[in-house]
């Protein structure tokens, strides 16, 4: 079973993430940031990852620490669940549309953290959610999952649609990358023999 649970406590946030990479998309989300819960739901459902996230943060100041630290903790949990990476496909990509919006996400479980985030948001907030926090979420994730991640919103007018297509595509790309390949069972997906 490729499951993991990570607890991260700081003076700003207390976060618990539990996941099963071979799940069915079940989720239990309580971050204190409703729009983040909505986006995490997209990852779970489209990634077919069973996901529990519980967070308590200093949201009386703003949502920054909570969103960033959830990304960090999710990255740690994914890295733990993937383990030595033997037999995974390593790469994943997905294009996802939602009405006028279209996003592409490409991921590589390379062991080298890197983020290219290109989303020309059409407004600064989605409800009360600051769209810049999505960058902090993904930066936290890549730095702690050890992945290279390219995110491009190719078109979109509605900022909610722009970000929702990003998270849906991320879930689907993640699912593809961590999928086990029977033909490569027990093998590290690299000519170097390590990742």
Swiss-Prot record:
Example of a GO cellular component annotation carried by this entry: cytoplasm
PROSITE patterns reported in the protein's UniProt record: IGP_DEHYDRATASE_1, IGP_DEHYDRATASE_2
Gene Ontology process terms (BP): L-histidine biosynthetic process
Compartments where located: Cytoplasm
Pathway noted in the entry: Amino-acid biosynthesis; L-histidine biosynthesis; L-histidine from 5-phospho-alpha-D-ribose 1-diphosphate: step 6/9
CDD domains: IGPD
Domain of life of the organism encoding this protein: Bacteria
UniProt keyword terms in alphabetical order: Amino-acid biosynthesis, Cytoplasm, Histidine biosynthesis, Lyase
Top-level EC class as recorded in UniProt: lyase
Keyword Ligase: no
Pfam families given in the database record: IGPD
Family matches, as SUPFAM superfamilies: Ribosomal protein S5 domain 2-like (SSF54211)
Alphabetized GO MF terms: imidazoleglycerol-phosphate dehydratase activity
E.C. designation(s): 4.2.1.19
Reactions catalysed: D-erythro-1-(imidazol-4-yl)glycerol 3-phosphate = 3-(imidazol-4-yl)-2-oxopropyl phosphate + H2O
Family, as annotated: Belongs to the imidazoleglycerol-phosphate dehydratase family.
The protein's name: Imidazoleglycerol-phosphate dehydratase
Organism whose genome encodes this protein: Burkholderia vietnamiensis (strain G4 / LMG 22486) (Burkholderia cepacia (strain R1808))
Source organism phylogeny: Bacteria, Pseudomonadati, Pseudomonadota, Betaproteobacteria, Burkholderiales
